[in-house]
């Protein structure tokens, strides 16, 4: 499982290396909005490689389960809910209100209940999870994971379909560093983040992963039934 973490952090390392190699000190650092695109792209590239080089349904199921539970659930759900929570906290402060630990607990629980509705039971203590998240002390950071993952999902699919030309285009994006705005960087990758289309397409891709996960499980269970 930690291989996905290693791939993620190497994505940051490769991004910063290329940006600093091709830009000056003042232009090298990219926008925070884009910062998690290269890291999550590495997770997607590794997963695609593992899937394309194995015929073992159990292994492929593990890879897809890892993508869904780590790459997508962690970045698309956990961090996005943290961003929603952070927004509500800032709205109170901007309106001249004050907060304390019980209030923060109340807000966190409200965000969880609003998102999950009646589908998931929110147990006692779930509202305390805001206490362990260092990203809250890094400015408006949590939302960048879902933003970056939307871009990397679209680009990784292009690499699968187009091959080397898409790879070369992505390397140019990484080399650009902070010389382009987030919208421009995404456009260089062929992704228009000014519309909701990339987000909807990414959600549809997650749905296709779930379908594949179910198909692999059915295949495994059918094989076991024959034994």
Model-assigned labels for residue ranges:
Residues 1-9:
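Short alpha-helical catalytic segment bearing the HExxH-like zincin motif
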Residues 2, 30-34, 60, 100, ...:
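Conserved acidic
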Residues 3-4, 24-35, 74, 137, ...:
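Alpha-helix N-cap/helix-initiation motif
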Residues 6-7, 14, 41, 52, ...:
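C-terminal, non-catalytic "cap/extension" segments appended to globular domains
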Residues 11-25, 45:
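Catalytic Zn2+-binding segment of zinc metalloproteases
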Residues 19, 29-59, 68-70, 74, ...:
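Post-HExxH zinc-binding segment in Zn-dependent metallohydrolases
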Residues 22-28, 51-64, 162-169:
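Short, glycine/acidic-rich hinge or "gate" loops at secondary-structure transitions
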Residues 22-32, 61-70, 90-92, 132-133:
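Short beta-alpha connecting loops at secondary-structure transitions
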């Amino acid at each position: 499982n930690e291989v996905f973490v290693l791939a993620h952090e190497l994505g940051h390392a490769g991004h910063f290396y290329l940006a600093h190699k091709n830009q000056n000190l003042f232009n090298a650092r990219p926008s925070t909005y884009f910062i998690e695109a290269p890291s999550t792209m590495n997770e997607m590239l590794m997963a695609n490689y593992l899937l394309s080089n194995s015929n073992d349904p159990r292994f492929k199921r593990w890879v897809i389960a890892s993508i869904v539970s780590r790459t997508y659930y962690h970045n698309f759900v956990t961090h996005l809910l943290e961003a929603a929570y952070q927004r509500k906290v800032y709205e109170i402060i901007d309106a001249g209100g004050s907060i304390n630990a019980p209030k923060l607990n109340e807000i966190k629980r409200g965000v969880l209940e609003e998102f999950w509705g009646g589908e998931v039971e929110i147990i006692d203590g779930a509202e305390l999870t805001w206490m362990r998240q260092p990203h809250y002390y890094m400015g408006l950071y949590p939302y960048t994971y879902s933003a970056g993952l939307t871009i990397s999902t679209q680009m990784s699919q292009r690499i699968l379909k187009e091959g080397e030309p898409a790879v070369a285009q992505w390397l140019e994006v990484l080399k650009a560093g902070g010389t382009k705005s987030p919208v421009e960087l995404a456009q260089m990758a062929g992704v228009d983040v000014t519309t909701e289309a990339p987000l909807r397409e990414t959600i549809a891709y997650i749905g296709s992963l779930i379908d594949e996960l179910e198909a692999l499980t059915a295949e495994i269970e059918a094989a076991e039934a024959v034994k």
